[in-house]
Amino acid sequence: MTFLIAVVMLGLIIFVHELGHFLTAKLFKMPVSEFSIGMGPQVFSVDTKKTTYSFRAIPIGGYVNIEGMEVGSEVENGFSSKPAYQRFIVLFAGVFMNFLMAFILLFVTAKISGRIEYDTNAIIGGLVKGGANEQILKVDDKILELDGKKINIWTDISKVTKELQDKEEITALVERNGKEENLTLKLTKDEENNRVVLGISPKYKKIDLSTTESLDFAKNSFNSILIDTVKGFFTIFSGKVSLKEVSGPVGIFKVVGEVSKFGWISIASLCVVLSINIGVLNLLPIPALDGGRIIFVLLELVGIKVNKKWEKKLHKGGMILLLFFILMISVNDVWKLFN
C-alpha cells in the first residue's frame, strides 16, 4: 500500500507539472508530438492527428515533447520560433501548476478538516495505546501537580517533565470525578526528540472554517512552506547541510510509509510539501531545468544574446550533473534504509 500511495502521489505531482507545459504549448499553437505519463517502454498509447498520448511502464515521471525545444532547432511554429514571452510562460507553467495544486490541496483540507483548537487546561483528552500510564490515568483526569509542582495549564506538564527527566517514576495529584487522587506515574523516554513523556494528549475541538478562512489558511500555509523550502535549498547549496541528510525518491517512499499511518490529511500535507519542493527545484537556475531555460529567455528579453552552441552544451552538462546528483542521493537513501 505504501508503494502504491507513493507512486500515485509522485505520479500526480509530475503529471500536473507536465500538464502545465502541455496546455500552454497548445495555447500558443506549438506542436506537441507526445504527452507521456510514466517513463520507460510504452505500454499503451492513443494517437491523434497532432499528439500521441502514452502510458509507459515506469509509473513515476512523465514528459511533454514540445517540438523545437532543442536549442537552435528550426521547426515550424516550434518552441524556439515563438516570442520570448510565450516561451517564458510555457517554461513557468509547470511550476505554476505545482504551486496551484499545493494551494488547492491546502484549501480543501482546511475546508474539510477545519482547525483544531487545543484546550489549554491540564485535562487529559487521550492516552497512548499500550503506554506506561494507560491503565493508571483516565480521560478527563485533571492534572493538578507533578512531583509536588503545581500544574496550571497544559504546557506546564512538558516543562515539569523536562525538569524531572532523570527520574523513572513521579508522583501526581489528579482530580477525577470531583475528587483528588495521588498516583504514581511512569516517565517514558522519547529518544528521537530527547525528552520524557507521560503518554497523554490534551482535549481538543474541531472548528469549521468558512471559505474565506480556508483561503486565508491556504495562503498563509503556502507562503510558509514556500519560504521554508527556499531556505532549505539555500542551506543545501551553501554547504551547511550534508548531502547525507537530503532524501530523494527512495527516501520519499519511506516518509510516505510513516505519514500514511496518520490518515489522508497527513498524506495530503506531504503531497503539498513535495509539490512545492518540486516546483522550487525546477525554478533553480540550473541548465536543463525549467529555471535554467528561463534564465536564457530572460536574457533574450533584455537584449542579451547568448551563443546557441554554448547554451546547448550548458543544458547537456546540467542534465548530467542533475542525474549524477539524483543517483548520489538515491544511493544514500538505500544505504540509510539498510543501516
UniProtKB/Swiss-Prot annotation:
Chain segments annotated as coiled-coil in the UniProt record: none
Any matching Pfam family: Peptidase_M50
Binding site for Zn(2+): H17, H21
Membrane topology listed for this record: Multi-pass membrane protein
A GO term for molecular function: metalloendopeptidase activity
InterPro entries documented for this protein: PDZ_sf, Pept_M50_Zn, Peptidase_M50
Gene Ontology terms describing biological process: proteolysis
Domain PDZ: 96-179
Cofactor names: Zn(2+)
Predominant place of localization: membrane
Keywords noted in UniProt: Cell membrane, Hydrolase, Membrane, Metal-binding, Metalloprotease, Protease, Transmembrane, Transmembrane helix, Zinc
Entry keyword annotation includes Hydrolase: yes
TM helices/strands, residue ranges: 88-110, 262-284, 318-335
Gene3D superfamilies: 2.30.42.10
One GO CC term, this protein: plasma membrane
Positions of the catalytic residues: E18
Known EC number: 3.4.24.-
Subcellular location: Cell membrane
PANTHER family: MEMBRANE METALLOPROTEASE ARASP2, CHLOROPLASTIC-RELATED, REGULATOR OF SIGMA-E PROTEASE RSEP
Family recorded in the similarity comment: Belongs to the peptidase M50B family.
Protein name: Putative zinc metalloprotease FN1322
Organism taxonomic ancestry: Bacteria, Fusobacteriati, Fusobacteriota, Fusobacteriia, Fusobacteriales
